[in-house]
């Protein structure tokens, strides 16, 4: 919504049809500026079908890779199928999107790519083997792409959110992590998060707008932490 408020034209994609319908209703006032498309970034054909909806666009100014799935696992419980699904979605999917949009990004005067990481790209936690590995890989993909694409003036940066109120904030039992007593004790009462609260999507939106805009035209290969200071206390 913050990007649309900047008068941008947006292709908004999600693998979840229900989520797309909710977004379409929420963003109805921007109906002339946003196109919705179902997508599975593990599938090249699905990506092509989504991008066909904007084939009339002469160029693309920005790409935000925000797709991710979470799998609770560790070295004893993970299997290859679950591992591959997380890596393919959270890491390889971003590579596919970048490769598919590069031709039109090159035509932009100020092209930018943002990859959404996590604090877990930097700090390992229990039972998050595949997710943390994928996010760590996405960090290096961001830096490597910044080097590779600099010659085309394409900037590539990342945002690393902490505990943000999204669909992924709910546990398998349906409990919101911000409401868990363990979260309140460790992260709020004991100051693990210096700002003493969980974050919201609105807390993140300004960083996305900034990295897509000309205000960050000499910034590439960098990561902005949006975590209330959590990364300072690890």
Regions found by a protein language model. Name each.
Residues 74-75, 82-87, 189:
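Substrate-binding pocket helix/loop in short-chain dehydrogenase/reductase
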Residues 209, 220-234:
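Short C-terminal tail/terminal secondary-structure segment
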Residues 118:
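Residue(s) in the substrate-gating loop at a strand-loop-helix junction
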Residues 76, 123-129, 151-152, 196, ...:
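Active-site loop immediately N-terminal to the catalytic Tyr-X3-Lys motif
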Residues 98, 134, 142:
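Active-site helix of classical SDR
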């Amino acid at each position: 919504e913050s990007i649309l408020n900047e008068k941008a034209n947006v292709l908004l994609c999600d693998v979840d049809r229900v989520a797309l319908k909710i977004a379409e209703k929420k963003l109805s006032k921007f109906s002339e500026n946003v196109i919705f498309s179902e997508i599975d970034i593990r599938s090249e054909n699905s990506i092509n079908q989504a991008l066909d909806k904007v084939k009339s666009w002469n160029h693309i100014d920005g790409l935000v890779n925000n797709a991710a799935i979470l799998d609770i696992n560790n070295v004893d419980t993970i299997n290859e199928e679950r591992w591959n699904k997380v890596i393919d979605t959270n890491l390889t999917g971003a590579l596919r999107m970048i490769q598919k949009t590069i031709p039109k990004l090159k035509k932009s005067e100020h092209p930018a790519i943002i990859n959404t990481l996590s604090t877990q790209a930097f700090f390992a936690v229990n039972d998050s083997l595949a997710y943390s590995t994928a996010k760590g890989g996405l960090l290096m993909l961001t830096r490597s792409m910044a080097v590779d694409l600099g010659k085309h003036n394409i900037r590539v940066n990342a945002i690393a959110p902490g505990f943000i109120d999204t669909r992924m904030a709910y546990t398998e039992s349906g409990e919101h992590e911000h409401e868990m007593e363990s979260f309140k004790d460790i992260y709020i009462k004991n100051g693990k998060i210096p700002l003493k609260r969980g974050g919201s999507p609105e807390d993140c939106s300004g960083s996305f707008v900034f990295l897509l805009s000309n205000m960050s035209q000499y910034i590439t290969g960098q990561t902005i932490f949006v975590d209330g200071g959590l990364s300072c206390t690890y």
